[in-house]
């Protein structure tokens, strides 16, 4: 059970970041060997079954290319202050998981662009290596040539301006920088991503037809699979943009209600009776909430001896949401609620290290639902 959350088999770590081969990677390895192996066998009949060993070596070189691409993202992400959680090479090439507050367009663009640049460097290194390998080392030259082509293609393809490709993140950052709106950047890059997805399938089908050839079924199906992945990623970016625009309509102040702060050792009779009370431990860490209704239910002579800790409802870890001001939108609150999950009912809002009040998840949802409803124009 300890390994249940792992995305695959761990290769090692990079500056503390675990690097995995995803569980879907063997699928792409089998596809590559099944397609590249016969091509090698046709070109070099003397190799026999060794052609498939050459194809297997190519899958390892392809894996190194993917890891290099994702490692570039991870290293620059760490440099820009991102918390990088893992690197995974999987069916879709690979991905780097990290946590960030989308601090700036520059950070987003830098993290995005270095992945394709890493592939471009590998392609250039391979091209230079071709000139150093003797002509009679045909298999070595074949492998190096395949690495050059693959990395060159990946570098160019990933720079196409559409989500979820790296070029899409660069486009997103540019629009974000020009408009000051991350939602606008995501929306533009998301729709461009859908154009790229459709164009990719069209290119796979139309290009052979222009040459007077019949499109190969395998490559058409593969392009449809890749385009489907691109379409879903682009759709996610569009949905995120729309959500961001919705969140921007509601300010933290709109859903915030006041709350008093009290140590968990305080007597209940000494607590404010008409407002919520946030209970903190001896270190000042908030861990519970007492609603006015709970104080009223416990009212009576015995209340004089009841401690706040006995009445407080324990809150789940992650219930504290930090914001720079109560005048910002509720994006940080929504993220905090999503991170905690369904168990949370309240968020404690903290500004500059000081509690500012409480936000009920129900009130947050109601405010967003109200903001989403179109307003009727005055008659």
Task: Kindly label every feature range from the protein language model.
Residues 1-379:
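Hydrophobic transmembrane alpha-helices and their immediate loop junctions
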